[in-house]
Amino acid sequence: MPYLDMPPAQVERVVCSITAAIKYQVPANIMLAIAEKEGGRPGLENKNRNSNGTYDIGRMQFNTVYLKDLEKYGITEEDVAQPGCYSYDLAAWRIRGHIKNDKGDIWTKAANYHSKTPQFNKVYRTDLIRKAA
């Protein structure tokens, strides 16, 4: 069933973001804003290393540092890189953790998905608020 006149990748982003937001109890506007901001593609193509040696994977640009926590469940880079809703679920799981456990307002906590470094968090936070409005 077609959804309005959106391209397939955008339909995936909207449907998967809202489904993951409900599943992990993350505000849908925050999940949609992060999905729009990240805007990655399926696959392992982003091998740009961060200063800590990690890199981002897939549609939600899921950082490899979090794979250490997911290893015990058998979750691999290849799993995160697949098209479909799985990467959105993993992102919502992470965002939920930030909202529950981090300090600050909800926007700062949500921006921790990108970075906890204040200067990077602030820029990302400002853009999230704009996108979520």
Q: What are these regions, as identified by a protein language model?
A:
Residues 2-133:
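Catalytic glycan-binding domains that act on GlcNAc-containing polysaccharides
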